[in-house]
Amino acid sequence: MIKKIAVLTSGGDAPGMNAAIRAVVRAGLSEGLEVYGVFDGYQGLFENRIQKLSRYSVSDVINRGGTFLGSARFPEFKQPEVRSKCAEILHSHGIDALVVIGGDGSYTGAKLLTEEHGFPCIGLPGTIDNDIPGTDYTIGYQTALETAVDAIDRLRDTSGSHHRISIVEIMGRHCSDLTICAAIAGGCEYIVAPEVGFNQEELIQQIELSLANGKRHAIIAITELVTDVHKLAKDIEARVGNETRATVLGHVQRGGSPCAFDRILASRMGVYAVELLLQGHKGRCVGIQQEKLVHHDIIEAIDSMRRPFKSDYLEVSKKLF
C-alpha cells in the first residue's frame, strides 16, 4: 500500500507546473499520504535533495510561472548506476511512488525507473512544445501560445508602420503546433513547419507575388531549428528589397503566469495522477483526449505512439492568408 509519494519537475520549465505540483501535494494529503518534493529534477534526486511538503508548501503557487521545485537537465541519468542510486535514495526515504512532470526526456527517466527497478512512476506532460504523445494538450502549451500571439500582435504593429517583413521564430522543436496555432491566431501570412519541409525559394517567390499585388508588410511564423532565421531575413531582404528582421521569441515563451486553461489542466492531471497511484497503477502517463483524462503505458507512449500533425490546421491557414 502506498503511503509516501514524491513529485519532481524535469527538463524545460512550463507555465502550470506549479499548479500540477500543488494538485499532487494537496490530493495526496487529502488521501492521507505523505508527499515529498524533489528539488531540481533528477539531478536533485541523485543529490538527495528531497523535502517533505505540507499543504502550505504549495500556497500561492498556482498563479506563478516556472516551478518552485526547480528543474534541471541531467544527462548523467542515462547511466544505469546513476539510476540505481536514485532508486536507492527514494527507498531510503520510504517513498513508494513518484510523479514526474516534464517532457519526453523526463518520461524516459520515469520509464527507466519503472522498467529497471519496478518503481511506480506516473508522468504528467509538462512542456510548452505540445509534443508529448497520448495527450491533446500539454501543461504550459496554451500559455505559451498566448505569449506567442501577443508577440506577433506587437510585431504586426511595428511591421505595418515600417512596411517591414518580420520573421518570428517560435519554440516547439520538431512539433509545429505552437507555430501553426500562433500563426492562425496572429494572422501571419506565411507558416514554415518542420513536418512539411522548408523550401526557401518557394517562400521568397510567394512574398514577391504578395508585394507585387500590393501587400506592404508580412509576418512569417517559423518553428525553431528549421533554418537560421537571421540569414533567412538577409536573403529575403536582398531579393525583395523590403527591410526584413527576425525575432527569436526564445525562452520568453516559457515564462509568465499560467493561463486559466493550464491551471485547470494541471490541477486535473495532478489529482488524477494520485488517483492512479492509489489504484495500483505504475509506469503510466497522463493525458487529456477529447476533454477526458486518460492514461497510457509510459513505455508504449515513448516507443510507439506518435503525435498527429495538425495538417488540417495548416490547410485552414492557407485559406486565410
Swiss-Prot record:
Mg(2+) binds at residue 104. Keywords: Allosteric enzyme, ATP-binding, Cytoplasm, Glycolysis, Kinase, Magnesium, Metal-binding, Nucleotide-binding, Transferase. It is found in: Cytoplasm. Signal peptide: none annotated. GO terms for cellular component: 6-phosphofructokinase complex. Pathway: Carbohydrate degradation; glycolysis; D-glyceraldehyde 3-phosphate and glycerone phosphate from D-glucose: step 3/4. Its EC number is 2.7.1.11. It catalyses: beta-D-fructose 6-phosphate + ATP = beta-D-fructose 1,6-bisphosphate + ADP + H(+). ADP binds at residues 22-26, 55-60, 156, 187-189, 215-217. CDD domains: Bacterial_PFK. Allosterically activated by ADP and other diphosphonucleosides, and allosterically inhibited by phosphoenolpyruvate. GO terms for biological process: canonical glycolysis; fructose 1,6-bisphosphate metabolic process; fructose 6-phosphate metabolic process. The active site is at 129 (proton acceptor). GO terms for molecular function: 6-phosphofructokinase activity; AMP binding; ATP binding; fructose-6-phosphate binding; identical protein binding; metal ion binding; monosaccharide binding. Substrate binds at residues 127-129, 164, 171-173, 224, 245, 251-254. InterPro entries: ATP_PFK, ATP_PFK_prok-type, PFKA_ATP_prok, Phosphofructokinase_CS, Phosphofructokinase_dom, PKF_sf. Its cofactor is Mg(2+). ATP binds at residues 12, 73-74, 103-106. Belongs to the phosphofructokinase type A (PFKA) family. ATP-dependent PFK group I subfamily. Prokaryotic clade 'B1' sub-subfamily. Catalyzes the phosphorylation of D-fructose 6-phosphate to fructose 1,6-bisphosphate by ATP, the first committing step of glycolysis. Homotetramer. This is ATP-dependent 6-phosphofructokinase. It comes from Actinobacillus succinogenes (strain ATCC 55618 / DSM 22257 / CCUG 43843 / 130Z). The lineage of its organism: Bacteria, Pseudomonadati, Pseudomonadota, Gammaproteobacteria, Pasteurellales.
